[in-house]
């Protein structure tokens, strides 16, 4: 099961605290899907604000091969849709609202086209249902080329990445995925599989 965070009344619930769903009006639930190289945690501040007055429950999802999820050898929009439908069934979601950014926006659009019975309202940020030609190769190759054995801190990684990735805000966003595990830095996004799947992610699949 993919990982997710639940925000209600401005508070974070752990994933297994699901009993309150019985009382929740599903038309007031908003699922948030992050973009490429993102994670559910990126939306934490926004989710808290949106849920603060108690009128909406926000569920931010870590998509396949991102965030707190275990890595999988495959990555595509169809597989991400399967993950989300399994999550909906697990949470007993019948009809809900979706907010998707970038890759998550395409996922939300495809979900609404493929499984319209699940979607009440749709919000899309910073993406269109088209094939994109932008070259993500330099970004992902720069991340893959980083020798993590030489990295002692995020500052070390930032200095090396700055040679090829000039935009500091972009580097800070990407470096959120650099995690210290047992004294060694590791990527929290499955870069090798993402690179292999990039053509699929840049396209808008024909249904």
Task: Please report, for each region that a protein language model flagged, where it lies by residue.
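Conserved serine/cysteine hydrolase catalytic core
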Residues: 182-207
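Alpha/beta-hydrolase active-site loop signature
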Residues: 37, 63-67, 129
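Alpha/beta-hydrolase fold catalytic core
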Residues: 1-31, 52-56, 93-94
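Flexible "cap/lid" loop of the alpha/beta hydrolase fold
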Residues: 109-114, 120-152
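Gly/Ala-rich beta-loop-alpha elbow adjacent to hydrolase catalytic centers
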Residues: 100-104, 108
């Amino acid at each position: 099961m993919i990982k997710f965070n639940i925000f209600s009344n401005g508070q974070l619930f752990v994933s297994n605290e699901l009993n309150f769903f019985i009382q929740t009006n599903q038309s007031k639930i908003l699922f948030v899907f992050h973009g490429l190289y993102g994670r559910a945690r990126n939306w934490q501040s926004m989710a808290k604000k949106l849920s603060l007055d108690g009128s909406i429950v926000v569920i931010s999802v870590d998509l396949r091969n991102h965030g707190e999820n275990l890595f999988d050898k495959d990555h595509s929009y169809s597989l991400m849709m399967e993950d989300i439908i399994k999550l909906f069934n697990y949470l007993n979601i019948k009809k809900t609202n979706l907010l998707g950014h970038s890759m998550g926006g395409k996922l939300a659009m495809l979900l609404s086209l493929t499984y319209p019975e699940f979607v009440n309202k749709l919000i899309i940020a910073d993406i269109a249902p088209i094939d994109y030609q932008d070259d993500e190769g330099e970004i992902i190759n720069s991340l893959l080329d980083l020798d993590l054995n030489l990295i002692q801190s995020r500052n070390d990684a930032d200095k090396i990445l700055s040679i090829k990735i000039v935009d500091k805000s972009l580097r800070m966003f990407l470096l959120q995925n650099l995690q210290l595990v047992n004294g060694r830095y590791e990527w929290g996004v499955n870069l090798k599989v993402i690179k292999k799947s990039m053509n699929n992610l840049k396209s808008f699949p024909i249904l």
